[in-house]
Amino acid sequence: QATILSLIPRAKSSTQNLADIAAMGAEPVTLVVSLSMPAHTTYGWVEDFARGISDSIVACGAHSCTVSGGDLGTSNDITVSITAMGRMHPNTPKPVLRSGAQAGDTVAFAGQVGWADAGLRLLLQSHNPYLADITTKQTTGKRPRCDDNAVQRALTAQLRPTSPVPAGVLAARAGATAMLDVSDGLLKDAERIAYASAVDISLSAEAIEALSKPLVPLAQAILHGQPRNEDADSYVSLAQECVLGGGEDHGLLACFPSGALLPEGFVALGSCLVPEGQQPRVLLGQRQAQARGWEHYQPL
């Protein structure tokens, strides 16, 4: 079983770029990597970083992708910049954008969502007994019941995320009208498709509940030691918050024509509707969902 120390993040920069290519229905073919670092950076760190990129390519299923070059430089801080390039297949020559969804389309998702956020919340709690257990392999007092594999999955999702890259090509072949990788939160990225395509997006409450259910025991672990929040409703609420507002899982959110057979790996989450107001909305059930997720240029 891996420890937290062995899960040092080394694959995130490549995974997020591979996901961007997949979200346009393309196949990643090469990465160009630029790395600037202080002169005292150890060779072992650089080797581990390079291995992480290679591992990420394999874990994401981007089997035709290579690292074709890049640049090295000296700087006060470590800076990583990766450019990914991909190719469209002959039978799907046009990239899938976020702006092509139509009213009546099915909204579907491939990958995992909410797990990276749960992992981050665990990592931000240095006092959490689960972290001590995984680091020292010792049990540290009474803790809520939770599968250690679920904790490990959440930590791995945050520190070494993967994206279902082959699903992007499958989606394009199946006629996807719009697609985006979920890096900033399911609601936030659904909202981006809604705005770009001028549609309302209605997410099924039942589908969100199904995605949230496996995270409820983790929510209990995260809230452990916070008595005011320790009730079943709080656990469910936090699990749904991870699914709806958490980012960095890099799953694929796509829209397909009504009645289309969803490609392997995708599950239906809802549908696109004719917008009722002046601005497109994302609905959860019958109610407008409050905006959640990461906004890069929003003042802190």
Stretches with model-predicted labels:
Residues 24-34, 67-70:
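Short beta-strand segments at enzyme active-site cores
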Residues 95-169:
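Short, acidic (Asp/Glu-rich) active-site segment that either coordinates a divalent metal cofactor
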Residues 68, 108-110, 202:
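Structural detector of well-ordered beta-strand residues that form the stable sheet scaffold
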Residues 1-4, 31-40:
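Glycine-/proline-rich flexible loop or hinge segments
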Residues 14, 120-123, 171, 189-193:
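Buried hydrophobic packing segments
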Residues 1-24:
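Active-site cofactor/substrate anionic-group-binding motifs, chiefly glycine-
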Residues 5, 39-66, 73-80, 85, ...:
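Glycine-/charge-enriched secondary-structure boundary and capping motifs
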Residues 17, 25, 67, 104, ...:
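Residue-level signal for inorganic ion chemistry
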